[in-house]
Amino acid sequence: NHSYYVNHYEKYGLTSEKNFHEKTFMFKDIDTAYYEKMSRIVKTRNKLNEVNFTSTHEVMKRTNEMFDLFNKSYAKLSSFVKINQEQKEFMKEKYIKFINPEYIKFVENENKEIVAFAIIMPSFAKALQKMNGKLFPFGFLNLLWAKKFNKDVTLYLIGIDPNYQKLGVTAIIFNSFIQTL
């Protein structure tokens, strides 16, 4: 945000309760060997496996587990409200089935229980600018192209079981995404 936002809101007596930090980094700047090594160590030490999907049907079978883990991993946040079954079904139909299954990653323990998940999506910003707000006659092609062939991605959602937090599980997830992209 622009710096004057803070002054404007503080003038009216408002204060910041939470701060949001966004980080952008280039994949070419990432040391992939580090993530591969850490991923291997964390998998061995904690008896974990990554789950990669090739079809939306496979993802849909396990989305209820994912949303249960989402509720569990975000429960301690002050402003979090649990997702109920009706909302789970809505999100499955509205969002999950439109995400490329390669962009959804799970980590499971030796009992095949999901202990972590992450969802990334391609950035549609450039495609939306290119189509100039017009979906038809050919604007939708820009969206389809961006969905399949995109160099920019956004990490939309990540959740880790509280019992597995601070064990390096994110190294498994990020290594899996690095290999996918």
What are these model-derived regions, one by one?
Residues 52-160, 175:
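A conserved beta-strand-loop-helix scaffold within acyl/acetyltransferase catalytic domains
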